[in-house]
């Protein structure tokens, strides 16, 4: 966000488009990085969001893990109005903004929100958040200290719906591999499409886990490519301070 510090602060309701979809999002003094970057640069996370749009076109149940202010949840609900989205967000301020964004777009139905974090166990833990005047854009993470929060593994969530779990989006600032471990039964039973944030320190663990269930992996990060390309995570070089988005599926894609 530093590159936008000398530009006017954005406050209001802003239109956001992903392929065929257009919806509104709230921003107050640059507090949502996705809106700020999209406003000044356009096509924010185009590859990732477009891929999620394609995934969620099929009716089913979807998880948005680390849902922040609801961008992926909104896309999943608009992509197919019959979908059901389960959104997990540990920061109550972000969750409040997500609910406001859902209400703004008349999307309060077919969505369940959980205030907490996802991992490989269910219980309590601590969540460390970096606050400043753009706190909605800052990533927090499960830590040894911070705010006490509820933690849940996806396999422990009771879903009273017989429809297939078709997709999981995971953006948890380094907890991503543990989220996969906590969803192993779901992944084994349903083989959902997965979009996951990957770092150098967890790429091998994530690759080995996905390979065990015969997933193919594709790079969908606008930061490093303009197209969806197949990639073997064990060969992918990621800088220590960066992350990339990976699309994992058992299907062949064009």
Show the residue positions of the predicted features.
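Short amphipathic beta-strand/extended segments with alternating polar/hydrophobic composition
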Residues: 24-28, 151-152, 227-233
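Short internal loop-to-helix segment that lines adenine-nucleotide cofactor pockets
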Residues: 40-63, 124-126, 138-190, 201-205
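Short N-terminal helix/helix-N-cap motif within the alpha/beta-hydrolase-1
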Residues: 71-74, 96, 123, 177-181
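Conserved acidic-Pro-Pro-aromatic motif
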Residues: 13-14, 80-84, 157-254
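Conserved beta-strand termini and adjacent loop/short-helix elements that scaffold enzyme active sites
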Residues: 28-30, 114-116, 151, 220-222
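S-adenosyl-L-methionine
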Residues: 1-155, 158-162, ...
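Short, glycine/acidic-enriched loop or turn micro-motifs at the edges of active sites
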Residues: 67-69, 92, 120, 172-174, ...
């Amino acid at each position: 966000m530093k590159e936008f510090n000398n530009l006017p602060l954005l406050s209001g309701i802003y239109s956001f488009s992903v392929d065929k979809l257009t919806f509104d999002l709230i921003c107050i003094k640059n507090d949502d990085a996705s809106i700020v970057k999209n406003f000044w640069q356009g096509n924010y996370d185009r590859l990732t969001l477009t891929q999620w749009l394609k995934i969620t076109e099929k009716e089913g149940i979807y998880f948005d893990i680390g849902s922040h202010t609801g961008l992926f949840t909104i896309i999943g609900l608009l992509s197919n109005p019959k979908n059901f989205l389960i959104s997990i967000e540990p920061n109550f301020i972000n969750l409040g903004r997500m609910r406001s964004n859902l209400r703004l777009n008349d999307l309060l139905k077919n969505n369940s929100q959980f205030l907490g974090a996802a991992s490989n166990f269910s219980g309590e833990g601590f969540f460390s958040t970096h606050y400043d005047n753009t706190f909605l854009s800052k990533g927090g993470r499960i830590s040894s200290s911070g705010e006490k929060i509820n933690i849940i593994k996806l396999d422990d969530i009771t879903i009273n719906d017989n429809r297939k779990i078709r997709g999981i989006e995971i953006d948890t600032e380094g907890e991503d591999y543990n989220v996969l471990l906590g969803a192993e039964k779901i992944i084994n039973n349903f083989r959902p499409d997965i979009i996951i944030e990957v770092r150098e320190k967890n790429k091998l663990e994530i690759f080995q886990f996905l390979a065990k269930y015969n997933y193919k992996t594709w790079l969908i990060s606008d930061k490093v490519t303009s197209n969806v390309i197949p990639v073997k995570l064990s060969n992918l070089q990621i800088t220590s301070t960066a992350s990339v988005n990976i699309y994992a599926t058992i299907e062949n894609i064009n």
